[in-house]
Amino acid sequence: MIKNLLLSGAILSAPALMVNAEPKVYTTDNLAQEIHVSLNGKYVAMGDYEQNLSYIWNIDNPETFQALPGESVAYEVANDGTVVGYIKQPGGVYRPCVLENGEWTLLPCHPAVANTAEANCITPDGKIIAGTQFINDPTSEIKGRYYPCIWKKNDDGRWTLTDYSYIKLPDHQGFLTKCLYVNGDDIIIGGRLYCGIGSEVPALIVNGELKFWNEISTYSEPLIWKGQYGAYDENGKQYFTDDPNDPNIFYYDYATVDGYRDGETGEYFAGEFSTVDAQGNFYGYRTRAFNVKEDGSGDLENGATIYNYGKDEWTDNTGFTNFAIGLGNADIVFANGGSMLVNGEKKKITEELGFTTDRIFTFVRSVSSDGKVLGINTAEIHEGTGEYQYFPAIVVLDEPLVAGIDNVIGADGVTIIVSEGRIDVAGAASVAVYDLNGRKVSSSATAHVASGVYVVKADDVVKKVLVK
């Protein structure tokens, strides 16, 4: 189903976004392109993949951007400060790693992994990591492909690898891991799938199985010029023939994506799921084809997109090139170009949230579950090269964007958010909410309840919560 408006959760009116005190903005002169805020807003991990340097920020010591050891790039951070990323080793080899107790630990890799493997995402509870490995494959044109993988933390603290190299991917570069969502027993990796001749589309890995929405077809055609078939003899010399059965005729491959001839006019599909929120909304961008004819011609339309995993629903918006992240329980979406959508209405982020940056504001990269802590990219132009350099900035608002959040509980991949008159549960396949008399009051992921004490059972997680 295609939708034009975002589904509303705990909807905020525009005045509710205006904070009472001046937001605090923390900056550094260290470069970083990767920025990730932990779900609880306590930590921010930052990585500079141009210099292989990383940093971590702690809300308890907000003026300090602490450097992480080694030539490393940090991608994400869990609620307890566990960081994942990669370490650069001698010879230009990149290996996935996890930072625990201030030290990097290398994660196990597939035995056929080539020079690149990364740990890209981690669950808020720090128990599951998702990543990417480039695995050698002589059948591939580029002699290998990027495959997704996960690592699970054992009771002894060690990490066990589950690689998905058995997944049949298009004969292209593979799948790049971008985000991770755990919903009960389901482990869902969001990312970018390379396909066709030169296209990229958003895709998921759901419990080790590839899921994407585009139809990819490949064909082979003979080379024809002026009514004759192009061919090559045993010495590699080209000639042309009228014989359609000549065994030396040269055939070239082409592909269609949703019926559109990929790259025929220099246009390709572009898309990925870049991030995901606690409600299972995957944010990113995608290309859609319209008016496709039998010859493969048609119209391509690019735009930002949101895919809700639980409802299997898309929200597309061609007014933006990309949706960076959002708060699905507050109908807030952060887009490219310093814009945000509040209940579907476009706003300028700095004006709506009441802060400024010394450098050029580019976009919000990550946000805490209550919207109080934002990790953003800022930029300035290098005087020597004329190119943009990207710097991190962390914005701490006086009040959370998600109205009335009183408590956030995380356990075993399940997140329970308690707010005034409301209980939201994310990451669980089954939910039941009981009052203290044992009466079930809700079995949905969002429960509107009166003030009081409730017992929330989400899969195997049982928590007692107070609703004001």
For each predicted feature, which ranges?
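Glycine-centered tight-turn motifs at strand-turn-strand junctions
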Residues: 422, 440-452
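A short acidic/small-residue loop/turn micro-motif
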Residues: 112, 382, 430, 445-449
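C-terminal tail/sorting-segment detector
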Residues: 453-468
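Residue-level detector of functionally pivotal "anchor" positions at catalytic/ligand-binding pockets or at interdomain
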Residues: 397-430
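Extended low-complexity, serine/threonine- and proline-enriched intrinsically disordered segments
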Residues: 231, 431-433
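Residue-level hotspots at or immediately adjacent to binding/recognition sites across diverse folds
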Residues: 21-401
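Short, glycine-anchored, charge-dense loop/turn motifs used at functional sites
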Residues: 434-439, 454
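Sec-dependent, cleavable N-terminal signal peptides
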Residues: 1-21
